[in-house]
């Protein structure tokens, strides 16, 4: 005989918890989502929620006053759950939602007065009958679909990656928008392509097989990445951390070499089997074979796509009908951008304090809709390298630039257009996901579409033209029939959630009509039920005045609470003789008595029955409405794609007009010619006019520009400016310049700045050399290379030798010959112009006025003659005594050697063997003995302009220390 009796609800909770052992389980209890046991302790700490307790069992072995057992409990109101779940997901947790399967069934089982449901309240557990619950979805970082939990203007991708014998299968999807795509990489660049794609997508979650042979060290799951951290713990301590704490610590344990910042999840190997994934995809997409969608002959892409689809189905607990079409793509039509280049060019995020505000997308994103913003973001992160689609896009932007009124009108029509893409995808999943709010947003968007179409009617053929060969043009269908259906079905201002309507109360005179989901007249059954039941509500509404008049008790009032339902309240000061005999006492208060009557209970029952039926009927009608929209989903998605493109194109046109951008001429050769180009981001932040600069590169005469000049003169800005103008041209945008001719590039490589990678034990110089090696190995003649101060992380001569060798390799190697900008402080490299025919010298100009340096920010032909390092040190706030001493040393050193001309740079000095002075302390060098001495000769040969600012400061500090000793 069991001595511990678990309550029925707790047995149900334990069973559901076993289904979602690796997730926090939110268990619906009436108006709250509750958590219990370890989950409760966790969220109480994480979310600052009060930790309480709830009786879950009786232990009859204990004394009677100690038999009740309590479980820790913490919960949140159902209407605020999105905020709490968002925070948990952001911390890396998985959240399982256990809902009551049938609200009306729960109502029927509830022992409270049935009148509580007339006010729209949800049920609680009864002691006799248990409400059935089930996990309706598991929310993970990559499967979020609720708009309240997602950023409006960015995608939330779930990705799946499988690697086998150097070949890669990749699939990704956004469950909130319905985007679903797959690719397979099989050549020698497969891993490089995967890394670039993961950098582009920035998935919130990446699925990998639970077999180490089929995944990369760069994509280790959480458990593997934390194994080292957990190893020192005892078994009990490790178990105490699982399953939640290991997830919370995922970022601490994540490998710095990981190719994604998203959550990495293991998915069982059998889910990746080719036979399984093929069957799942064909069944879901209703295809006779995978050849129809382009997956035939791509087994790894098939396995990745099928595994992802199964994961989505399992977490959503249903068919993910929003994933209706799979796009198989090839990276050959797009520019691959590695993570370093994306970071260096600050496409989506700046490394500075301004973050996204100082990025390229902050300049270009003038879209009016969330759909357009997401599309423009994809364009920026995936530039085209084929001229035909670029010309189509560029021509559309040009039309909108020229047609001012059309551009202004369409942007006005698009303003405040709801995110119909995400709303439609929730509707596609039916009543388990869709809400009246989604229907309302779709209706509001459809109402605005005729104005959008009218504004650009004459331009639609250009705006919606097919970009890729073989693709049909986009179609703009205002879907008037769908709008008509929604107008007839939905009330003017429906509540956000089902079950919140009040159908039984008529509009008060001069007041607003109560909110309801379904419009009167749409469904005859609903209207008939409302008419038949409304007199019960009207009776209760009139009861107070009726009873006052009948009894003569002026203080009598009719009230309601959740415990007792409707009641008649009479002050205890009233003479008991005035109280009718048929009044049944229900509750005694300090100053009043509460009563019910048979008549009141009868009408209260009618009202409760009506509420039950109305909730069921409303859900049925809403599901029917979702079903009626299913045949129109493809039309609506096509219209959404058209709206997104029009919005993105209009945004680029608006930026072009406001920024005085020009239409670049696109070419297929290696010309890169820009006249008075400007940095699009820096220009926007300056209060004074930006100083433009020219560049003229090609593969025949001027392939490599060596750019010298002082720090702060604008070299790095110019390098990024050229790369950004090129990238902008290859998304179809106009560019910030007076004129531009852009020979399309297949890749942009940047080596700008570096820092120690402490987590992987790599120094600044190692990081720099690794990145340089990658670009030298991966570049092609059509690439654009941007190099800034290669070799600065090591000794002067080592760095100079490496820098020169890199330039020679790019110039001479038959596989390369690509356009290159090479900024350097090694002035000796300007001699390469005489030795290599396709090298040209340029410098960022600066002049000295009244002892102060003025940076002109102008790119001029020829090499620089000075670095102005001491002036930069002064601007940085170096103490005046250090600046004075450095100036004296520089003057002395410059006086000991003949001046050099930029046109005739001296060869690097030969190494000097410096003998040691044998002292009791070992070898000691004298830096300040001005008598002829090998150390002095060494100093005379030292060239200050060759030093980076950091190296110069280190030398100065050492000199100052030695001077103080002497």
From Swiss-Prot:
Cellular component aspect of the GO annotation: cytosol
Keywords per UniProt: ATP-binding, DNA damage, DNA repair, DNA-binding, Nucleotide-binding
Positions of region (Disordered): 894-914
Binding site for ATP: 709-716
Example GO molecular function: damaged DNA binding
Alphabetized InterPro entries for the sequence: DNA_mismatch_repair_MutS, DNA_mismatch_repair_MutS-lik_N, DNA_mismatch_repair_MutS/MSH, DNA_mismatch_repair_MutS_C, DNA_mismatch_repair_MutS_clamp, DNA_mismatch_repair_MutS_core, DNA_mismatch_repair_MutS_N, DNA_mismatch_repair_MutS_sf
CDD domains: ABC_MutS1
Pfam families xref list: MutS_I, MutS_II, MutS_III, MutS_IV, MutS_V
Residue ranges, compositional bias (Pro residues): 899-912
Function: This protein is involved in the repair of mismatches in DNA. It is possible that it carries out the mismatch recognition step. This protein has a weak ATPase activity.
Protein name: DNA mismatch repair protein MutS
Source taxonomy: Bacteria, Bacillati, Chloroflexota, Chloroflexia, Chloroflexales
């Amino acid at each position: 005989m069991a001595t511990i009796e678990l309550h029925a609800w707790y047995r149900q909770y334990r069973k559901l918890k076993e289904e979602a052992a690796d997730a926090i389980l939110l268990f619906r209890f009436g108006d709250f989502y509750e958590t219990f046991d370890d989950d409760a302790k966790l969220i109480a700490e994480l979310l600052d929620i009060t930790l309480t307790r709830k009786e879950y069992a009786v232990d009859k072995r204990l004394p009677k006053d100690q038999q009740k057992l309590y479980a820790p409990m913490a919960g949140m109101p159902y209407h605020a759950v999105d905020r709490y779940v968002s925070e948990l997901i952001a911390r890396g947790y998985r959240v399982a939602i256990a809902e009551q399967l049938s609200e009306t069934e729960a109502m029927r089982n509830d022992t409270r007065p049935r009148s509580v449901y007339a006010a729209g309240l949800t049920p609680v557990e009864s002691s006799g009958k248990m409400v059935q619950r089930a996990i309706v979805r598991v929310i993970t970082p990559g499967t979020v679909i609720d708009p309240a939990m997602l950023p409006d203007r960015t995608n939330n991708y779930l990705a799946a990656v499988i690697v086998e014998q150097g070949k890669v299968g990749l699939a990704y999807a956004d469950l909130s928008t319905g985007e679903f795509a797959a690719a397979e990489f099989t050549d020698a660049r497969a891993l490089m392509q995967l890394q670039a794609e993961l950098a582009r997508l920035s998935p919130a979650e990446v699925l990998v097989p639970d077999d180490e042979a089929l995944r990369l060290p760069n994509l280790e799951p959480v458990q593997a990445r934390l194994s080292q951290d957990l190893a020192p713990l005892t078994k009990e301590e490790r178990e105490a951390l699982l399953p939640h704490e290991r997830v919370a610590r995922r970022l601490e344990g994540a490998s710095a070499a990981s190719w994604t910042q998203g959550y990495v999840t293991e998915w069982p190997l059998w889910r990746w089997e080719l036979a399984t994934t093929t069957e799942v995809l064909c069944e879901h997409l209703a295809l006779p074979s995978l050849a129809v969608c382009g997956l035939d002959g791509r087994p790894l892409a098939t396995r990745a796509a099928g595994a992802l689809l199964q994961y989505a189905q399992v977490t959503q607990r249903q068919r993910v009908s929003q994933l209706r079409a799979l796009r198989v793509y090839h990276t050959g039509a797009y520019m691959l951008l590695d993570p370093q280049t994306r970071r260096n060019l600050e496409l989506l995020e700046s490394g500075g304090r301004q973050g996204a505000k100082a990025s390229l997308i902050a300049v270009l994103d003038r879209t009016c809709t969330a759909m357009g913003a997401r599309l423009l973001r994809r364009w920026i992160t995936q530039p085209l390298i084929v001229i035909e689609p670029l010309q189509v896009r560029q021509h559309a932007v040009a039309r909108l630039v020229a047609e001012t009124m059309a551009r202004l009108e369409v942007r006005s029509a698009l303003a405040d257009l709801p995110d119909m893409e995400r709303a439609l995808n929730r509707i596609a999943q039916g009543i388990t996901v869709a809400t009246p709010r989604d229907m309302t947003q779709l209706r509001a968007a459809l109402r605005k579409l005729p104005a959008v179409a009218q504004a650009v009617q004459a331009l639609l053929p250009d705006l919606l033209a097919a970009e890729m060969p073989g693709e049909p043009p986009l179609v703009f269908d205002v879907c008037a029939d769908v709008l008509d259906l929604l107008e007839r079905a939905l009330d003017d201002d429906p509540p956000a959630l089902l079950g919140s309507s009040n159908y039984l109360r008529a509009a008060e005179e001069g007041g607003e009509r109560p909110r309801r989901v379904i419009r009167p007249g749409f469904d005859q059954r609903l209207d008939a039920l409302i008419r038949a039941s409304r007199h019960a509500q009207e009776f209760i509404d009139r009861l107070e005045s009726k009873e006052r008049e009948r009894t003569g008790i002026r203080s009598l009032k009719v009230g309601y609470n959740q415990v007792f339902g409707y009641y008649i309240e009479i002050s205890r000061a009233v003479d008991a003789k005035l109280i009718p005999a048929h009044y049944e006492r229900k509750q005694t208060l300090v100053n009043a008595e509460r009563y019910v009557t048979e008549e009141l209970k009868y009408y209260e029952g009618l009202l409760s029955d009506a509420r039950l039926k109305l909730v069921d009927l409303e859900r049925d009608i809403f599901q029917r409405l979702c079903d009626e929209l299913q045949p129109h989903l493809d039309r609506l998605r096509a219209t959404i794609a058209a709206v997104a493109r029009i919005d993105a194109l209009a945004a680029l046109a608006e930026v072009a007009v406001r920024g005085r951008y020009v239409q670049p001429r696109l070419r297929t050769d290696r010309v890169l010619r820009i006249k008075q180009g400007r940095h699009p981001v820096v220009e926007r932040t300056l209060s004074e006019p930006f100083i433009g600069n020219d560049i003229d590169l090609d593969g025949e005469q001027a392939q490599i520009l060596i750019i010298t000049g002082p720090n702060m003169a604008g070299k790095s800005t110019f390098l990024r400016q050229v790369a950004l103008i090129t990238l902008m041209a290859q998304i179809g945008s106009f560019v910030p310049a007076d004129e531009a001719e852009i020979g399309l590039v297949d890749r942009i490589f940047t080596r700008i700045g570096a820092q120690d990678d402490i987590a992987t034990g790599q120094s600044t110089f190692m990081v720099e050399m690794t990145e340089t090696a990658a670009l030298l190995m991966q570049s092609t003649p059509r690439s654009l290379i941007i190099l800034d101060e290669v070799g600065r992380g090591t000794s002067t001569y080592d760095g100079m030798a490496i820098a020169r060798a890199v330039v020679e390799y790019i110039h001479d190697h038959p596989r390369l010959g690509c356009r290159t900008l090479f900024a350097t402080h090694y002035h000796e490299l300007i001699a390469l112009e005489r030795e290599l025919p396709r090298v040209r010298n340029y410098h960022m100009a600066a002049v000295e006025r009244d002892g102060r340096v003025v940076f002109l920010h102008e790119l001029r032909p020829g090499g620089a003659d000075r670095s102005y390092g001491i002036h930069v040190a002064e601007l940085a706030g170096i103490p005046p005594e250090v600046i004075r001493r450095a100036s004296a040393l520089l003057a002395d050193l410059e006086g000991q050697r003949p001046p050099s001309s930029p046109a005739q740079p001296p060869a690097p000095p030969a190494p000097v063997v410096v003998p040691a002075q044998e002292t009791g302390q070992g070898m000691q060098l004298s830096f300040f003995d001005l008598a002829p001495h090998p150390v002095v000769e060494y100093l005379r040969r030292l060239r200050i302009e060759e030093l980076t600012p950091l190296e110069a400061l280190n030398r100065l500090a050492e000199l100052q220390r030695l001077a103080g000793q002497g």
